[in-house]
């Protein structure tokens, strides 16, 4: 699939924080966010998940992710949603982007290809910034997920 390095503008999102094994908590987060999206007619565009912990080094019960929906820069979170959602900004900067298809929920394969194959060959390395997936289709309906994985990067020294 396609791999590239891009300069990205900041992106505002609304999010629900989930904690626990990713394969259990992220689908529940999508269900919650989807319900709020419909109920409150949130003017969102892209569905994404920000990852804060590495499942290879952190215990599953402590894994944190933000199930998110991109919104316009001028979007203001209504007071009735402030107990449910957090408004945040994915920072601008240099990102590696890997476009791939995930079948059989094998996200580990996609992430492994990014970190073990594409990034080492690119001349860039991951930084401590944002790391997230953007979902490009309804994988529950289609039986597979087309995704873009974004990882903040810097040039190798």
From Swiss-Prot:
<keyword id="KW-0963">Cytoplasm</keyword>
<dbReference type="InterPro" id="IPR050908">
    <property type="entry name" value="DNA_gyrase_inhibitor"/>
</dbReference>
<dbReference type="InterPro" id="IPR024911">
    <property type="entry name" value="DNA_gyrase_inhibitor_GyrI"/>
</dbReference>
<dbReference type="InterPro" id="IPR029442">
    <property type="entry name" value="GyrI-like"/>
</dbReference>
<keyword id="KW-0346">Stress response</keyword>
<dbReference type="Pfam" id="PF06445">
    <property type="entry name" value="GyrI-like"/>
</dbReference>
<comment type="subunit">
    <text>Interacts with DNA gyrase.</text>
</comment>
<dbReference type="GO" id="GO:0008657">
    <property type="term" value="F:DNA topoisomerase type II (double strand cut, ATP-hydrolyzing) inhibitor activity"/>
</dbReference>
<dbReference type="GO" id="GO:0005737">
    <property type="term" value="C:cytoplasm"/>
</dbReference>
<comment type="similarity">
    <text>Belongs to the DNA gyrase inhibitor family.</text>
</comment>
<dbReference type="InterPro" id="IPR011256">
    <property type="entry name" value="Reg_factor_effector_dom_sf"/>
</dbReference>
<comment type="function">
    <text>Inhibits the supercoiling activity of DNA gyrase. Acts by inhibiting DNA gyrase at an early step, prior to (or at the step of) binding of DNA by the gyrase. It protects cells against toxins that target DNA gyrase, by inhibiting activity of these toxins and reducing the formation of lethal double-strand breaks in the cell.</text>
</comment>
<dbReference type="InterPro" id="IPR010499">
    <property type="entry name" value="AraC_E-bd"/>
</dbReference>
<protein>
    <recommendedName>
        <fullName>DNA gyrase inhibitor</fullName>
    </recommendedName>
</protein>
């Amino acid at each position: 699939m396609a791999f590239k390095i891009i300069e990205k503008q900041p992106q505002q999102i609304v999010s629900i924080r989930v904690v626990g094994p990713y394969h259990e908590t992220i689908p529940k987060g999508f269900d919650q966010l989807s319900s709020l999206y419909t109920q409150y007619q949130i003017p969102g565009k892209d569905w994404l998940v920000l990852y804060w912990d590495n499942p290879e080094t952190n215990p599953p019960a402590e894994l944190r992710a933000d199930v998110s929906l991109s919104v316009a820069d001028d979007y203001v979170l209504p007071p009735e949603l402030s107990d449910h959602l957090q408004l945040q900004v994915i920072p601008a900067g240099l990102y590696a982007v890997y476009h791939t298809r995930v079948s059989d929920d094998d996200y580990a394969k996609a992430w492994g290809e990014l970190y073990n194959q594409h990034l080492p060959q690119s001349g860039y390395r991951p930084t401590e910034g944002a790391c997230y997936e953007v979902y490009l289709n309804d994988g529950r309906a289609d039986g597979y997920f087309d995704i873009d994985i974004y990882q903040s990067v810097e040039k190798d020294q």
